[in-house]
């Protein structure tokens, strides 16, 4: 949707994925591929909004596995 999102809390996850592509979404957060592996986004802050759990952001903004961040 053309809005920026800041990743406020994240942690590395085992595995590999395509950089910038959501690998999975679950109750704990959103797993995204990077050039060096996977990251679990735990807390994010959408542009102009308060910080929120990444899982809530995914539900509210239609982020699903296969979504390419930067094209949401």
Which residues fall in each region the model found?
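An anion-binding loop in the catalytic cleft
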Residues: 1-72
């Amino acid at each position: 949707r053309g809005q920026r999102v800041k990743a406020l809390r994240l942690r590395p996850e085992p595995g590999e994925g395509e950089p910038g592509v959501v690998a999975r979404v679950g109750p704990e957060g959103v797993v995204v591929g990077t050039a060096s592996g996977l990251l679990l986004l735990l807390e994010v802050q959408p542009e102009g909004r308060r910080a929120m759990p990444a899982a809530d952001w995914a539900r509210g903004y239609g982020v699903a596995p296969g979504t390419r961040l930067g094209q949401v």
